Amino acid sequence: MRIAVIGAGKWGSALHLALKENHNCFISSLHQRDLEDFVSIKEALECEYLVFALSSQGMRAWLKENFINKGQKILIASKGIEDQSCQFLDEIFLDFVPKENFCVLSGPSFAAEVMQKLPTALMISGINQELCKKFASFFPDFIKTYIDNDVRGAEICGAYKNVLAIASGISDGLKLGNNARAALISRGLIEMHRFGKFFGTKEETFLGLSGAGDLFLTATSVLSRNYRVGLKLAQNQKLDSILAELNEVAEGVKTAYAIEKLAKMKGIYTPIVNEVVAIFKGKSVQEATQNLLKQND
């Protein structure tokens, strides 16, 4: 049995380190990297099990360019919604593999802590529960895994919390205090759940690891790149310069636009996401924050 992680960024590297503890695991990306167990894309696609840790915005293009369906079993470890199409990652993968052949990984998990082998709990979601159990069995003891079948709920939580983390970073950057941040996160959880209900998700997904757990982690720590984007926006830095300086992908930026478009199409009330997008477009963080503080629901 051979596993390959596709994507050699921080998260992909952390997953590779964890999975190689007990299994024959490789790592690959489009560009040659000086990493242990690095293999070419062609070699990686020969593995029976694939873990995708690519940027959500680049996933479709990568699959079109490189993927050859050989019956591989797939774990989607990326978190985001494609901005251009407003499609979730499972919808993108359905163009390439049957739904029985993939699962989604979610939950509170900073790459740095996984690489330190600190205790972590993750959720694996899929309609093929046997495949979920199989992927769960690959992880080492310091990573506790749970399984369920709420794929869309897990994806919405994983994507939405990144936008809320930006909002939380803005709040902290403006030094509005712990009370304001707690209010923002709790109202954000309600907003995220309200959005998710339109897609037939389960309430418990939003209250568990995929939802509340990942949100609380990502929205309260400088280890979160999305939270750091919010901190810098609060200092009146321009988004383009923030992202250039970050030199990493902050999934919450593109995802915010996608959520806003989906919410408008379906008539879903998403005030926090709307204000974050407005800030991206030039609205002052002070005005946007005041608008949120005045919201009644």
Curated annotation (Swiss-Prot):
A family per Pfam: NAD_Gly3P_dh_N
Species this protein is from: Campylobacter jejuni subsp. jejuni serotype O:2 (strain ATCC 700819 / NCTC 11168)
Pathway assigned to this chain's UniProt record: Membrane lipid metabolism; glycerophospholipid metabolism
One BP term from GO: carbohydrate metabolic process
Major place of residence: cytoplasm
Keyword Disulfide bond: no
Active site residues according to the UniProt entry: 161 (proton acceptor)
Keyword Oxidoreductase tagged: yes
Protein's name according to its UniProt entry: Glycerol-3-phosphate dehydrogenase [NAD(P)+]
Keywords: Cytoplasm, Lipid biosynthesis, Lipid metabolism, NAD, NADP, Nucleotide-binding, Oxidoreductase, Phospholipid biosynthesis, Phospholipid metabolism
Role of this protein: Catalyzes the reduction of the glycolytic intermediate dihydroxyacetone phosphate (DHAP) to sn-glycerol 3-phosphate (G3P), the key precursor for phospholipid synthesis.
Binding site for NADPH: 11, 33, 79, 111, 225, 249, 251
Annotated Gene Ontology cellular component terms: cytosol
GO molecular function, a single term: glycerol-3-phosphate dehydrogenase [NAD(P)+] activity
Compartment(s) of residence: Cytoplasm
Gene this chain is encoded by: gpsA
Sequence similarity: Belongs to the NAD-dependent glycerol-3-phosphate dehydrogenase family.
